[in-house]
């Protein structure tokens, strides 16, 4: 039987740790940042026990540091996730997640009649928040979608 203090996921020397991702969202985050195509070692923890969430996902990406722009995209998938930059096995920086006001070229508009499906234009959404709910309003067709509807398509 494992010692109670034993880590279930190995520590990394340098890189980024994204913790407290809601369960079943980790793979989407992995694909969003194309970590599944990275040559660096990526450790994925799915459905790990969490006192706050019940279950959570965790990503550790060696020798890779996410940008503030990537952190704002991450906020759409996991607004309460924590992002830590690691150097020499120590947390050197905690990156706050802030929802962007606008997000362009990341998500596909769910409206099949939207101009973004037939023309060479990047999708663009205004991010709307109301309490804990996050909605995205398409710049072109002006339809409003819940965050889950848009992020589930991609």
Swiss-Prot record:
Specify the superkingdom: Bacteria
Q: Which UniProt keywords apply?
A: Metal-binding, Pyrimidine biosynthesis, Zinc
- Which residue windows are coiled coil? none
Pfam families from the xrefs? PyrI, PyrI_C
Q: Which InterPro entries match?
A: Asp_carbamoyltransf_reg_N, Asp_carbamoylTrfase_reg, Asp_carbamoyltrfase_reg_C, Asp_carbatrfase_reg_C_sf, Asp_carbatrfase_reg_N_sf
Record's keyword annotation contains Zinc: yes
GO MF annotation list: metal ion binding
SUPFAM superfamilies cross-referenced by the UniProt entry: Aspartate carbamoyltransferase, Regulatory-chain, C-terminal domain, Aspartate carbamoyltransferase, Regulatory-chain, N-terminal domain
Q: How is the cofactor bound?
A: Binds 1 zinc ion per subunit.
> Which residues are listed for Zn(2+) binding in this entry?
109, 114, 138, 141
GO cellular component: a single term: aspartate carbamoyltransferase complex
Q: Which cofactor does it need?
A: Zn(2+)
Q: Name one process (GO BP) from the record.
A: pyrimidine nucleotide biosynthetic process
Describe the family membership recorded for this protein in Swiss-Prot or TrEMBL: Belongs to the PyrI family.
Which PANTHER family does this chain map to?
A: ASPARTATE CARBAMOYLTRANSFERASE REGULATORY CHAIN (PTHR35805:SF1)
Q: How does it assemble?
A: Contains catalytic and regulatory chains.
Q: What does this protein do?
A: Involved in allosteric regulation of aspartate carbamoyltransferase.
Q: What is this protein called?
A: Aspartate carbamoyltransferase regulatory chain
Task: Name the source organism.
Answer: Aliivibrio fischeri (strain ATCC 700601 / ES114)
């Amino acid at each position: 039987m494992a010692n109670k203090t034993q880590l279930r996921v190995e520590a990394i020397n340098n890189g980024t740790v994204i913790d407290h991702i809601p369960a079943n969202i980790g793979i989407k985050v992995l694909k969003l940042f194309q970590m599944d195509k990275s040559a660096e070692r990526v450790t994925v923890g799915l459905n790990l026990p969490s006192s706050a969430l019940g279950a959570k996902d965790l990503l550790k990406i060696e020798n890779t540091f996410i940008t503030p722009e990537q952190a704002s995209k991450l906020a759409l998938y996991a607004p309460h996730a924590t992002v830590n930059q690691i150097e020499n096995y120590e947390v050197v920086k905690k990156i706050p997640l802030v929802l962007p006001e606008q997000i362009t070229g990341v998500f596909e508009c769910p409206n099949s009649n939207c101009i973004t499906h037939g023309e060479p234009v990047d999708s663009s959404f205004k991010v709307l928040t109301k309490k804990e709910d996050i909605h995205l309003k398409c710049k072109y067709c002006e339809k409003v979608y819940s965050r889950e509807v848009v992020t589930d398509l991609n």
